[in-house]
Amino acid sequence: MRGEIGSCFYRGVVTEQQIKMESTRAGEWELLRQRHLRAEGERPESSARGIHHLALLSSDVERTIEFYQGILEFPLTELFENRDYLGSTHFFFDIGNDNALAFFDFPGLDLGPYREVLGSLHHLAISVTSDRWHHLRSKLEAAGVEIVFEHADSIYFNGPDGERLELLAEPLGEMNGRPVL
């Protein structure tokens, strides 16, 4: 396992305070489950049809296309001017299962690097087959992309603008072999 100090991926020495916090949080999680979680047959149907697209920011359209289409093999499906910001590019990649990953560039705006703040995207987890996972991991390493964290058949790494991504060889609707949908 690899990790970064100061990030949620750090897996170093565990302190007594962390053990105490985990024990406290486990009790909180159980209360939340009892209060809000319903068995599969008892849950209402979702009002959503799915994710239309998730939009991230790009500082360099060409570099973003080379990374997502060239390395991760997500086909570019459309590119046009952003309707909300003249001169801005809005472009889309197919990430499977009728889901799109979109990007904007905002020329002329002074945007800072990716930061983890409340309400922001922590990471985007994308499911692939085991064979594809090994293939894409090799392509990432060959391209010099650092694997930030690894656990079993899951790897975390950063995209061209620091966006945190996860590739995992686990079926949709499962997490650590456990159904989540």
What do the predicted segments below correspond to?
Residues 57-100:
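Core segments of cupin and vicinal oxygen chelate
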Residues 101-104, 166:
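Conserved beta-strand in the GNAT
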Residues 38-40, 78, 87, 108-113:
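A short, acidic/glycine-rich surface segment
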Residues 2-44, 50-59, 91-96, 112-181, ...:
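Vicinal oxygen chelate
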